[in-house]
Amino acid sequence: MSIFIGGAWPYANGSLHLGHIASLLPGDILARYYRAKGENVLYVSGSDCNGTPIAIRAKQEGVTAKEIANKYHEEFQRCFRNLGFTYDCYTRTDSEHHHKTVQKVFLRLLEEGHIYKKTVEQAYCETCTQFLPDRYVEGICPHCHEAARGDQCDACSAILDPLDLLEKKCKLCGSAPSVQETEHFYFALHTFQEQIKVAVETAKQTGTWRDNAIQLTERYVKEGLLDRAVSRDLPIGVPIPVEGYEDKKIYVWIEAVTGYYSASKHWAEKTGKDDQEFWDREAKTYYVHGKDNIPFHSIIWPAVLLGIGEGTIPRHIVSNEYLTVEKRKLSTSKNWAVWVPDILERYDPDSIRYFLTVNAPENRDTDFSWREFIYSHNSELLGAYGNFVNRTLKFIEKYYGGIVPKGSIDVELKDKIEGLYKHVGEAIEQTKFKVALEAIFDAVRFANKYFDERQPWKEREDDPVSCEETIYNCVYLIANFVNLLEPFLPFSSERVRNTLSIVKRNWEPQNTLPNRIDSVQPLFERIDVKQIECEIEKLYGAVK
């Protein structure tokens, strides 16, 4: 089976925070799981280096947009690598290959009659003497009356036209813009109304889109899909490939989602492999992002794919809700966030991955609390999983000289593990990652109980053969926990694999156990709970 996984592209205008990772982590879990199953996986993403936010940041700092994009693209790559993300291709939207692919898609849509020219009114700043890109216009959302940008309202997820805003002002100078006529290209989105309606109805029946994606898309379909501008007067971006319009850029809402396609083509070019299988109707596709990106993946991108004749529109939309920080809405402008480069300096990446999975905002907003983060590490990773692995392997090291005793796999344990693979696999495929991880940790707690009840420290003296059976079965459990947890906790899984000399990584019960173990080291270190206050003080102290 061909599995395509697309992770949303973060804007390269500032550091990643845990809200980004909470929405993107499911992509890596899926990729690792499907690779272990032996499926053909293509997992792509990249840095959005063309957006208006980058141009604004560059102007504020007095540097070029390229310098800003380079800085954060490189930082993103380090963060994703240090968190264990296994992208097959992580690229950027200001690359030549991306520009060429986007321009080809634009021309194909133009040839097929899905793009047309239209004279429209656009916000113009007399002070800055320029037409204002949508994100350069700020004001009040006409739907929910919250503060909003000219392209979208974060509060109610409405896609906006900047002229719809109330109390409009230029983001650069703060003055009220005038309205002038200009010519732009438009995408005939209304012509895909019925196909999008069928797609959302199918997703509703099969449960392959998150509820928030279904509800929001149904709302747009009910209201009627409106044609959208595909060109803008932007300072940076992909030039319109039509004579006389080269100064205009392809609007980021269509250009950025086409990044999945350009990354796929770039991967094929670099590896010499054919990527068409990932765009065929039979391919299984997952698009992983936050709820603010829903309409771009449930409406815009499917319409673009249909418009260029590709068979596979998004089958699974994994659109997480928002992550709050200490019960407050995350705010980058106020510096109320937990920044990824910072937390990675002091904490195990598996601790971050664990917390953001068991507390994932899959169906509702969830909160990142330093207290909960540190206690979950100490009680679950260290106290449950790390404890079981350490006590078993230390027992072997102390009483068997590192040689794994011989035994036979207990039938009840074997059935339990086989059932666990099936249950966890189904949960991952259905994008229920929290359910999957909790099921594994239920089994870990069962394993600790098994160790306690068997009391190998007593069996060793009273019934040495039973003791060997107990320890053998504990190693059996560990070998399979490593396999089951690898999509979630890759770093600790790798450490245990090395200790047990386990090479196989396929998604099936591990029934062949190692003969000996290498030097046993603690899987996790206890985090001093005094760190809770330190981290909270640091968080509040950094607020702007």
Curated annotation (Swiss-Prot):
Q: Supply one GO molecular-function term.
A: methionine-tRNA ligase activity
Name its species. Bacillus cereus (strain ATCC 10987 / NRS 248)
Q: Which HAMAP family match?
A: Met_tRNA_synth_type1
Tell where it localizes.
Cytoplasm
- Its Enzyme Commission number(s) read 6.1.1.10
Which PANTHER family does the entry mention? METHIONINE--TRNA LIGASE, METHIONINE--TRNA LIGASE, CYTOPLASMIC
Spell out the protein name for this chain.
Methionine--tRNA ligase 1
Q: The organism sits in which domain of life?
A: Bacteria
The answer to keyword ATP-binding applying to this record is yes
Family designation = Belongs to the class-I aminoacyl-tRNA synthetase family. MetG type 1 subfamily.
Q: Where does Zn(2+) bind?
A: 141, 144, 153, 156
- Keywords in alphabetical order, please: Aminoacyl-tRNA synthetase, ATP-binding, Cytoplasm, Ligase, Metal-binding, Nucleotide-binding, Protein biosynthesis, Zinc
